[in-house]
Amino acid sequence: MIKYILIEDERFAYEEVKRMMKKLRADYQMSGWAVSIEQAVELLKQENIDLMIVDIRLSDGLSFEIFEQYPVDIPIIFTTAYDEYALKAFKLNSMDYLLKPIDEKELDAALCKFERRNCPTPKTPAYRQLEETYL
């Protein structure tokens, strides 16, 4: 099961992403929600997660400060109403950069990209047969 956290200080945006995630990936488990840099750092220290969905502008600063305080090697889908932070986001572990309001198809595409890069593909019977024969 994929575990993720959502870092978002706007209640409406949080509810929308949560709704979309339940619809698009019902098998994913949200392990926590943070609304500030401080809460996000504490959440990262406590939770073992596979993915982060992170708003860039939080009420107490830019979310990049989270990773200065607590560096992580976790894939991140950034969300924001501003396109000026894209370059900085991609220098981190960014899987994607979604502009608000978030489009469900774009979130789905970002999740597919995450899955292609980070989730092991189940071996088909034909692949297992090849392994047994040649390895």
Segments predicted by a language model, with ranges:
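Extreme N-terminal starter segment of soluble prokaryotic enzymes
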Residues: 1-4
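Conserved acidic carboxylate
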Residues: 8
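Charged phosphotransfer/docking patches of two-component systems
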Residues: 11-15, 86
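Charged docking surfaces used in two-component/phosphorelay signaling
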Residues: 15-22
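Short, charged helix-to-loop "capping" segments that act as catalytic/coupling loops
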Residues: 22-30, 59-61
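Short hydrophobic/Thr-rich beta-strand motif most characteristic of the beta2 strand and flanking loop
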Residues: 27-35, 43
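CheY-like receiver
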Residues: 37-43, 50-127, 131
